[in-house]
Amino acid sequence: MMNMQNMMRQAQKLQKQMEQKQADLAAMQFTGKSAQDLVTATFTGDKKLVGIDFKEAVVDPEDVETLQDMTTQAINDALTQIDEATKKTLGAFAGKLPF
């Protein structure tokens, strides 16, 4: 059986690895897209919006609702990508905890 000191060392090592993975993830960028890529939204891995792009074809003053829907679609797509990457990157640590 592992003694308490070894468990603490292992937990600290895992914490440092996890912090590094979180920093790596935060530095990444994720771009979500709407249908036909008419709207794109780019976020950092820590969910900060860094850019949004509208293709000319979607900008219609008579149809603002479509632009709103596509913007929502692009944002949700990017956030889903971030959640999946976070789960994949940090989920591995759950099984490594020494307790």
Swiss-Prot record:
Homodimer. Keywords: Cytoplasm, DNA-binding. It comes from Streptococcus pyogenes serotype M5 (strain Manfredo). GO terms for cellular component: bacterial nucleoid; cytosol. It is found in: Cytoplasm, Nucleoid. One of its GO terms (molecular function) is DNA binding. Binds to DNA and alters its conformation. May be involved in regulation of gene expression, nucleoid organization and DNA protection. Transmembrane segments: none annotated. The lineage of its organism: Bacteria, Bacillati, Bacillota, Bacilli, Lactobacillales. HAMAP family: DNA_YbaB_EbfC. This is Nucleoid-associated protein SpyM50270. InterPro entries: YbaB-like_sf (IPR036894), YbaB/EbfC (IPR004401). Belongs to the YbaB/EbfC family.
